[in-house]
A protein has these predicted regions:
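Non-catalytic protein-protein interaction segments used by genome-maintenance enzymes to assemble
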Residues: 38-96, 100
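Residue-level detector of beta-strand face positions
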Residues: 33-35, 62, 114
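A short acidic/basic microdomain associated with nuclease active sites
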Residues: 20-43, 47-49
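Single conserved hydrophobic/aromatic residue that forms the stacking wall/gate
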Residues: 1-10
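Substrate-binding beta-hairpin/strand module that engages nucleic acids
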Residues: 70, 74-76, 107-126
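Generic C-terminus detector
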Residues: 100-101, 113
């Protein structure tokens, strides 16, 4: 089901059109792994911790524009129309970490963050 849904994104959605164009121009990047070190105090409520926590992840995709980077992540959560804010809230911290990692890896600013909800067939700006 997910691959069919992704095909729908790629064919019909504005995001898909932009991804196709970026791919043609060599500006589309998919499944980008990263490992970043963060002070524990930045990730947890334990103030004063001097330890470094390694955060490992895989960014579903991003593409480069003249203005910077558009970050995107696919979500399979079961949602009802109107639940967009729930999705944004649920993944806010994850997307902040992805944004930070991309900016450090590329030296470019992330100018837009997008979540694609398969259950809503909708692209949501985060």
């Amino acid at each position: 089901r997910m691959s069919r849904g992704l095909g729908d994104v790629y064919k019909r959605q504005t995001l898909g059109r932009k991804m196709r164009q970026a791919q043609k121009e060599g500006r589309l990047h998919r499944e980008q792994p990263f490992v970043m070190g963060y002070p524990a105090r930045d990730l947890f409520d334990e103030r004063g911790e001097d330890e470094t926590v390694l955060v490992q992840g895989i960014i579903d995709g991003y593409y480069e524009t003249d203005d910077g980077i558009v970050l995107m992540d696919y979500k399979t959560d079961s949602l009802k129309p109107g639940d967009e804010k729930v999705l944004i809230s649920r993944y806010r911290r994850q997307m902040e970490l992805y944004r930070d990692a991309l900016e450090k890896m590329t030296g470019k600013k992330v100018v837009k963050c997008l979540l694609y909800s398969f259950s809503l067939s909708e692209t949501i700006e985060c």
